[in-house]
From Swiss-Prot:
GO terms for biological process: rRNA processing. The Q motif is unique to and characteristic of the DEAD box family of RNA helicases and controls ATP binding and hydrolysis. Belongs to the DEAD box helicase family. DDX47/RRP3 subfamily. GO terms for molecular function: ATP binding; ATP hydrolysis activity; RNA binding; RNA helicase activity. Keywords: ATP-binding, Helicase, Hydrolase, Nucleotide-binding, Nucleus, Ribosome biogenesis, RNA-binding, rRNA processing. ATP-dependent rRNA helicase required for pre-ribosomal RNA processing. Involved in the maturation of the 35S-pre-rRNA and to its cleavage to mature 18S rRNA. The lineage of its organism: Eukaryota, Fungi, Dikarya, Ascomycota, Pezizomycotina. It is an enzyme of class 3 (hydrolase). This is ATP-dependent rRNA helicase rrp3. It comes from Sclerotinia sclerotiorum (strain ATCC 18683 / 1980 / Ss-1).
Amino acid sequence: MSSVKRRKTEKNTSSGLKSKQAKEPKEASPLSSPEPTEENQNNEIEEGTEEEEVTKSFKDLGIVDSLCEACDTLGYKAPTPIQRESIPLALQGRDLIGLAETGSGKTAAFALPILQSLLDKPQPLFGLVLAPTRELAYQISQSFEALGSIIRVKCAVIVGGMDMVPQAIALGKKPHIIVATPGRLLDHLENTKGFSLRSLKYLVMDEADRLLDLDFGPILDKILKVLPRERRTYLFSATISSKVESLQRASLKDPLRVSISSNKYQTVSTLIQNYIFIPLVHKDTYLIYLLNEFAGQSAIIFTRTVNETQRIAILLRTLGFGAIPLHGQLSQSSRLGALNKFRAGSREILVATDVAARGLDIPSVDVVLNYDMPQDSKTYIHRVGRTARAGKSGHAISFVTQYDVEIWMRIEAALGKKQEEYQTVKDEVMVFKPRVEEAQRHARNEMKNLHEDRGKKGAVLKGRRPANGAKRGRDEMDREEG
């Protein structure tokens, strides 16, 4: 099948499609920033806003020269607001609750103080970071190793879905930092001979609200019981909830709270947000139209189900787009491979379930397309947070069908502002319809073959009972739904 993907050359005029310059979309006004709030005088609260002075360097915050050099090497020109507010407090030895939007630099905000303390008093098993997903755990470890390269920090990633024996060997080598998903860490605490965290100095719970959304609460309780009381604890999250408040009371001592966004559903000011109201039957056609509008830019397309992720990836590849799927039913190596290809630019479109919506380090995403609407405002915030990161601009467009109007109205209400519609010309969109329909037929056949292959494999395994059911359950919890 011939490609419908617009390429930025004169050959577009012979493709059979109407050739035109991608017009500038009608921009929605960026969400207004919250008014600066006065610092709460309560000893437990330390508020910050993005209006504060931005000229401070990492050295001004108290970071030592060797770590400042690492920041410079990684291209960290100046601290982000969450880093400016939290690092000095962490260096004072306080427990912290850090609240800031996705993409604000939370990882360096807790990694730098831990590495500086490790530099002063080096010891094995110094810090533990708990993360909700395997991908996020790997990325946090990479950040620690990059920032701590000068001091040769050693990290171990302990996550579900991987062989426990190599992990036990890695723990036996006494790394400085462990980054783990809760279920697999508890497996090792209970079953790996000689492994304990009695000497731990730092605990970080990253994406704490997501940890609790995935029902890790009981496992976290068990982990907290075996950790030393004399430790520093940092809890970082994009949003706050009653569950997070309960976790804070159970695990932190007299914490200071750093909050960069006073609005629970705040998005960054460099993000353009639009919606497009379309009939359900034409979603694929509008998707191809938009991808041509944003030709040459990287994009994440969010879907609700694994099947839809697979189908759209096949559809796009059939039409000549470099698309790759990411969802929770892929093997760990396949998921990491998909992310690496997308980061490297060998694939420009990532089609993903919400497994990709939280914490993933993909700094160059230009466009987020909500092909399927998220079911709540919090998920929407984390999806669109994949673009407009670290001060860059970005664009998010949500597909609103006749069945999504109520959800979209709730999201707009939570954001506190109505979004503008992305302007399209129906005749220009429908030019793509014949080729899209042909690609849809091909995708349906491919999906049918895929399901038949899976059915055959399932028949072979039918009736087998997995050994060690409890351990398997924890591994399943370590995997993101979808």
